[in-house]
Amino acid sequence: VWTGEEGTWPAFNYSQLPLMGMCQAELKFLFMPYMAQTDEVIACLKTHPEVVIISQSNHPNRIGEHRALVHQLMSEGLKNPVIFFQHYQEEDAEDLQIKAAADMGALIFDGLCDGIFLFNQGLLPHAIVDATAFGILQAGRIRTSKTEYISCPGCGRTLFNLQSTIARIKEATSHLKGLKIGIMGCIVNGPGEMADADYGYVGACLL
């Protein structure tokens, strides 16, 4: 039961519409799968623009079902924000990052996403799951929460250890939220690749 504690907001499932309607919170969350878009739910959402929908799916094509939910809301004229919930069972951080980025990236670049909610049923710390979510949001230009780095992979023209240089630059600048820093191995392609960076680090070139 939501007690009105500062910094917290109530969440409901689609079977709790009467309770949600009586709640006086300025912001409410509604967990809703695609199949729950009944006439009753649609009518409720039309009178409650403060509700943020959390789209859930267990369908084999989860991304397709998330898309279908948003398009159905749009066809009803609803403008409630939509957050996509994705459930994973990963033990390796890189596996989670790749799968979550592929899933959420498709929805973000469709322009359908207001937020993402990642849940991992495994041994990975919550901090890694949260960092993955924030990284995806930043890559999709939805929310900036940290310094952004642009780097080339390095090639035969790179005359220094690119990986260790990136690590040193990150250590010195990771607190500069919102800054975009380009780190390039040479002057040949570097300036073009980091054209939209705020600052750049470019190595020497072997011609």
Label the predicted regions:
Residues I187-E193, A197-L207:
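Nucleotide-binding motor/catalytic cores of P-loop/tubulin-like NTPases across gene-expression machines
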